[in-house]
Amino acid sequence: STLLASSAASDVYKRQMDDIIDLELEKVEQIIEKIAADPEDLDVRRVELELWKKIREMARKGRRTGLGITAEGDMLAALGLRYGTQEAIDFAVEVQKTLAVEAYRASVKMAAERGAFPVYDAAKEKDNPMIARIREADPELYAEMEKTGRRNIAMLTIAPTGTTSLMSQTTSGIEPVFRTVYKRRRKINPSDKDTHVDYEDETGEKFQEYNVYHHNFVKWLEANGYDTSKL
């Protein structure tokens, strides 16, 4: 997994993320314009038009974004920590704490450069549990946030990242390894070369099964002298 780095080079990425939010707002604006220009009767398209106007309003007010992680299970395994043990939990807590504090720090710094999100009000959120944790973890950061605000109403999202993790061949989100080995199916044309039918669904579609080995499990086997050519 990759943590937000507190370095000069990371400022480029902070600005890029902020620019991406602006691009998303522009897309919402384009959708509203398209609906407004639709020749269909206004009464028919009013619900859709008002919905997107509300989305635009809330997006502008909060500039919400979501910074998360994936491959935590692989990270713990690489460090020799067993998922679910107290040692692994304590380490994962520190990772999440670092992620949260640095995300808030980046947003506060961006607010000083480009302005806080429009509805920021330090007094209204002073008793918020998340803000209280940031205040406890870094009092100086909290004091700076009270003065300048922050760029985003929310910054952290821990998503399942299922498809992304399949693509990157890592464990998913903050979850452990699903399985070191499991079977998947792919749809086939039975007349194709080197195929065989392992499963046929109720519509007659035919599938071939194949083994999937967790990518980093294979690397572990290789590092420990196992012959992976026989997998």
PLM regions and their residue ranges:
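Single conserved hydrophobic/aromatic residue that forms the stacking wall/gate
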Residues: T2-A9, Y13
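Short alpha-helical "patches" and their helix-cap loops
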Residues: S6-S7, R82-E94, I174-N189
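Internal maturation/activation junctions in enzymes
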Residues: D11-R56, R60, R82-T161, Q169
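Contiguous, well-ordered alpha-helical segments that form the cores/surfaces of helical PPI scaffolds
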Residues: R63-A78, T163-L166
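Residue-level recognition of conserved structural "scaffold" positions that shape functional pockets
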Residues: G73-M75, E87, Q169, T180
